[in-house]
């Protein structure tokens, strides 16, 4: 499964493009999702029931200039639900994983919320995409998360970059949280 964006087969500017291939790379199906604005996917994972969860950003839907979009599909790429998260400024998701209870954890970037010019955002949802909690992490500079994984203790490990902390410009930033998104350590 491959996720990204396309201008060639879109309803508007760019649309989210999801392609399912067989083991030899032959296309089994391809789907586009989006509206009249720019929509892009940065992460896709197969879910426990054989469907897919897609995360990215949308300028077609939501509350702001660019919002996080989460799309849940069946095994054939048909939308089961789609949700947006964000504020009046730019928000983006770079990583999504299904959690052990069937919900989702989403990591990315927000300039709508947090302490600085842009902060890491971590959103925990239930199986239907409803927010259980959302947390931001960062300082007065810029932070962005590119990957999130659930850990064996039920918490999360988040990898990204920081401009606020560290020795230089855009250092690697690793955050370990508990199951509720509270920081246990950050390095």
Regions of interest found by a model, annotated:
Residues 1-187:
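A sequence-level/structural motif corresponding to short, flexible coil/turn segments enriched
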């Amino acid at each position: 499964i491959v996720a990204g964006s396309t201008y060639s087969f879109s309803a508007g500017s760019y649309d989210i493009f999801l392609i399912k291939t067989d083991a030899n790379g032959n296309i089994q199906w391809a789907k586009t999702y989006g509206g009249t604005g720019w929509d892009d996917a940065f992460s896709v994972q197969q879910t426990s029931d054989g469907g897919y969860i897609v995360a990215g950003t949308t300028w077609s839907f939501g509350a702001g200039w660019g919002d996080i979009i989460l799309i849940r599909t069946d095994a054939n790429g048909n939308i089961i639900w789609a949700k947006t998260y964000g504020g009046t400024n730019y928000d983006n998701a770079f990583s999504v994983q299904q959690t052990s209870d069937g919900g989702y954890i989403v990591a990315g970037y927000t300039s709508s919320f947090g302490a600085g010019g842009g902060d890491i955002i971590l959103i925990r949802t239930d199986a239907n995409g409803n927010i259980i909690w959302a947390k931001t992490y960062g300082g007065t500079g810029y932070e962005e998360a590119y990957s999130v994984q659930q850990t064996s203790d039920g918490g999360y490990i988040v990898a990204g970059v920081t401009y606020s902390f560290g020795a230089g410009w855009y250092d690697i930033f690793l955050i370990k949280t508990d199951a509720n998104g509270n920081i246990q350590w950050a390095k």
